[in-house]
């Protein structure tokens, strides 16, 4: 299951004012969301769980940890216990990434992916190499973005007034089209600051198999209100057969590292 590929970014159409502004940096933070079903479906009639996100700055990059878990009630009776954990580390220059994803269903591991990816400085194609499953390699198109860079680019473009943006994204949450997608993001008008999280923008992202050029039915859809600090509110994850909603319950700012 594709569960949470964080936010989108741009490959082209940069607005001149964005180049003059300081690039976005995600605020190191930890957030906990209450998770539930966004309407009864033929797949699930109820769901109860949580979604946790942590972004921790390091001297040479940024590490993220995400976990989504819920117990879903099935139409014919019975329950589904689902738990997925996803971690990444990305270098400060946005060119290197390590990733790990493991999902559980009813307490059993059903999927696991681990590896690393790299994009070259010359703007050419990159490569992802998996240790789980062993021996799997993927070619990444030129200018493919990793998740943290993807999110920061989207914030930059929202601040510059962009309304529709698109990008190739690699997140490591699978292999093939599960990990490498073409993302189109629609950005709404900014929401005034309410607290330390700052101003925010409503966003709707559609994830397509990259080979299809983003023209067919999306594999996955994601919407949220994203702040300039990288904090999400009002999250909706649409898998097609069912959709989940997540509301921010707790937020904690984390201290930055001391780097020489």
Task: Annotate each language-model stretch with its function.
Residues 1-4:
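Positively charged n-region of N-terminal signal peptides that target proteins for export
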Residues 6-15:
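Bacterial N-terminal signal peptides
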Residues 100-260:
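Mature, soluble, non-transmembrane domains
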Residues 25-34, 60-65, 94-100, 198-208, ...:
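Short, hydrophobic/aromatic-rich segments at coil-to-beta transitions
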Residues 66-119:
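Hydrophobic/aromatic-rich structural module bridging two neighboring secondary-structure elements via a short loop
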Residues 20-79:
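N-terminal cleavable signal peptides for secretion/export
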Residues 35-39, 53-59, 70-74, 88-92, ...:
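Beta-strand elements of well-folded, non-transmembrane domains
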């Amino acid at each position: 299951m594709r569960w949470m590929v964080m936010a989108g970014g741009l490959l082209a159409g940069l607005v001149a004012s964005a180049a003059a502004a300081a690039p976005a940096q995600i605020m190191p933070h930890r957030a906990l969301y209450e998770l539930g079903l966004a309407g009864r479906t033929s797949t699930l009639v109820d769901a109860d769980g949580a979604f946790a996100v942590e972004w921790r700055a390091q001297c040479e990059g940024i590490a993220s940890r995400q976990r989504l878990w819920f117990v879903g009630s099935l139409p014919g009776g019975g329950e589904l216990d689902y738990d997925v954990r996803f971690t990444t580390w990305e270098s400060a220059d946005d060119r290197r990434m390590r990733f790990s994803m493991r999902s559980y269903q009813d307490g059993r591991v059903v999927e696991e992916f681990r590896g690393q990816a790299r994009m070259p400085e010359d703007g050419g194609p990159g490569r992802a190499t998996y240790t789980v499953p062993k021996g799997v390699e993927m070619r990444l198109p030129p200018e493919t973005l990793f998740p943290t860079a993807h999110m920061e680019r989207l914030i930059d473009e929202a601040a510059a007034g962009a309304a529709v943006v698109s990008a190739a994204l690699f997140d490591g949450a699978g292999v093939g089209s599960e990990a490498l997608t073409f993302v189109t993001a629609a950005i709404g008008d900014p929401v005034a600051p309410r607290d330390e999280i700052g101003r925010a923008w409503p966003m709707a992202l559609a994830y397509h198999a990259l080979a299809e050029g983003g023209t067919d039915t999306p594999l996955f859809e994601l919407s949220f209100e994203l702040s300039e600090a990288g904090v999400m509110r009002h999250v909706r994850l649409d898998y097609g057969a069912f959709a989940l909603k997540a509301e921010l319950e707790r937020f904690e700012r984390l201290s930055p590292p001391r780097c020489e």
